[in-house]
Amino acid sequence: MVENKLTRALRELVAAAVKNFALPTKPERGFAEGELRAPQVVSGYLPPKRTGQKDDFPFVLVRADEGATDQDSTEVKVSIIVGTYSEEYDGHEYCLNVMARIRTALCSLPGMVLANRYRLQHPIKWSTYAEQPYPYWQLDMQTTWDIRTPQPIDKEEDF
């Protein structure tokens, strides 16, 4: 549950960071150019593709990938995956620009704390794939968050 709340808060931050960033989309059949739109921010994974649906690109996926809990704290690794579309061979730069906006939003968090409870650890990592599925481009960001581990309440304590 804590991980879901973390990714929800992170999706809100990401959505605010990219909301005014117009990126190209795949042209629909019969059109020379696609429309420009901000990346959709999605929890977890892209939904299965159905016939007749618009292309998913551009997008930003936010998902908790792994975690570890000890007595005092929980560490959660969250991936932020950026996908863009461009028929130009410098299309990977769209991914870098989206990543830069997200990174700026993350590094601007007061005290590196999101929603008053999730502490961002540095470094923020990112990587691209050597082989990109042209004309689609992808970049992966890796963030690590510290959360205070919920403590059990002793039923015999009187509050």
Please annotate each region the language model reported.
Residues 57-59, 75-77, 136-140:
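Extracellular structured ligand-interaction cores
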Residues 4, 89-96:
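Ordered, soluble secondary-structure elements with a strong preference for glycine-centered loop motifs
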Residues 75-88:
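Short acidic, glycine/tyrosine-flanked loop/strand segments centered on an H-E-D-like triad
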Residues 67-73, 130-134:
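Short, solvent-exposed beta-strand/turn "edge" segments of beta-rich domains on protein surfaces
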Residues 1-70, 154-159:
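Small/polar-rich, solvent-exposed N-terminal microdomains that initiate assembly or binding
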Residues 70, 86-90, 147-151:
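Residue-level signal for secondary-structure boundary sites
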Residues 64-65, 83, 144:
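Generic short beta-strand segments
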Residues 93-159:
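Acidic-leaning, charged glycine-interspersed low-complexity segments
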